[in-house]
Amino acid sequence: MSKPVVAIVGRPNVGKSSLFNTIYGERISIVHDTPGVTRDRIYAETSWSGRDFIMIDTGGIEPDTGDDVILQQMRIQAEIAIETADVILFMCDLKSGLTAADEEIAVMLRKAGRPVVVCVNKSDYVGEQPPEFYEFYNLGLEDVCAISAAHKLGLGEMLDLIISKFPPADESEEQDETVRVAIIGRPNAGKSSLSNRLAGAERSIVSNIAGTTRDTIDSHIENEYGSFTIVDTAGMRKKGKIEDVIERYSMVRALAAVDRADVCVILVDAEAGVTEQDARIAGLAHDNGKASVIVINKWDLIEKQTGTLETMEKIVKDRLPFMDYAPVLFISAKTGQRVDKLFGLIKTVYENSKKRLTTSVLNKMISEAVTQVPTPQDKGRHLRIYYGTQVSVQPPTFALFVNDKELSHFSYERYLENQLRRNFGFEGVPIRLLLRNKNGEED
């Protein structure tokens, strides 16, 4: 099931990042930081009272000089968060009191019609709040709570309010073999064009279904390769002077799409090359264990010389080294060049993500691998692998039972991963290795 998204919005310096970091630092049911964006730490997957959700910190949008720029930043921040989130957590500052900027944001939130919880930060009072707290009810938003992010007061009540606004949990997930495909990439990489090309090229589109993300459209397609649902995240077309804000929220759309997908199509603009943002988006797919295909779009616009394709392939491998297992396809969504090859690759990596190895086959490979390259040692003690077994799929995950996992080394684990790929394929799929001591302790 797709996780609800909660966006923290508010003017600068009201404590958005402080609240986010308090939750992160105290590990209040935090599952893990969303991979690929830990440097910014603006996304975290969280659970409260049995409901998983994604929290977004819109911190880091600091004002430039001039009130107009500040208001522009707040407006862009709030608008994009509204589009992305299922629930808005609107943070204000009790010590500063109700401000004109708070009122302007509240106007936008009321017009949007999204569920909102007003969170008044920097309240160190237990029980009855001071008169200035009740001024925030004048914002015209029904749910108002008081917290202190710094002193960890009121967080439970705030989280209870948030999850009460979530859509009902839908347990009726698809059980058929429909492959959910997320097309992710930077703004203007061609996500919408590719989605339209894939849908338009097929005569057997069953339906267009409104997706769980507000402006996402899911296209259901059937062809000779099977049944596919394309999750298009191309609704993000806003232009603005605050480009970093736009790019940060393109990550939110990618995050929501990745969460729902079986396979990720990572779309790269051939003219722009592989950027840092591309690497971070690809990291979402890799670290969430998704089968992936890297697609270089707009290849028709690149002037070709001998070795041009090979050069681009090398650039992709160099800048996305953690995804060296993913196939690379060069296309033009605009002209349709080589787009017909994409469904075959999607089907292949999907099937690889669900591949299971018997314990006997796996242990035969491990034995041969250890014979070829002995396990690492430390002070005369060798790592000993007693046996291995596959514990899950999507991604393929293998538990190796050992004498002492501290004797292992990432380079040897990488060697074992390479042996798995050499013997069994797994193209397009990350592989997870879990080292467990005989007492059950896990790496």
Model-found features: residue ranges?
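Hydrophobic alpha-helical bundles that form the membrane domains of multi-pass transporters
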Residues: 56, 60-110, 137-139, 143, ...
